[in-house]
Regions:
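Small beta-barrel nucleic-acid-binding modules, primarily SNase/OB-fold domains
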Residues: 1-161
Length: 161
């Protein structure tokens, strides 16, 4: 009888240990923000779908003063992510072999957040999903909507010439 109690206690202790190891895993992500709409997550290059942000070297004008809007878009994304885990829903691969995805922090779409902050645009050519967010930022003159700017696709086109 005494031996059976020892076995039962040992089995219960072992089961509890396994349970805690499985359900209390420390999550770790290798994450780097590349620019306003691209991240590297665990070795995978991910481009956010449905939005476009200014290029890192792109500037805007606010009351005649240059504003580093491309750098700000990256900073806003970096600050939003903070130390939180990022979860992405893949939507395919683009011609540059990047994963196309919508990514979330605490169940909030990073794309929606960036567009509503005024430092990203709904990329209507590919999706209309974030148009309401863009309308909100534009109407309220948030972020780049309070400045003079070139759309990122126009900026890139002008740099090719």
């Amino acid at each position: 009888m005494f031996l059976n109690k020892k076995k039962i206690i040992l089995v219960i202790s072992f089961s509890l240990l396994i349970f805690f190891l499985i359900f209390n895993q420390v999550k770790s992500q290798d994450l780097r923000v590349v620019d306003g709409d691209t991240i590297h997550l665990n070795g995978e290059k991910i481009r956010f779908t449905g939005i476009d942000t200014p290029e890192l070297k792109q500037t805007c004008l606010k009351e005649g003063v240059k504003d580093p809007c491309g750098v700000k878009a990256k900073q806003i994304l970096n600050n939003k992510i903070g130390n939180n885990d990022v979860e992405c829903i893949s939507e395919g691969i683009d011609q540059y072999k990047r994963t196309l995805a919508e990514c979330f922090v605490n169940n909030e779409s990073l794309s929606s957040y960036l567009v509503r902050s005024g430092y990203a645009f709904a990329y209507r050519r590919y999706s209309k999903k974030f148009v309401p967010d863009e309308d909100y930022a534009r109407i309220n003159k948030i972020g780049m909507w309070s400045m003079e700017f070139d759309y990122p696709w126009d900026y890139r086109k002008s740099k090719k010439n």
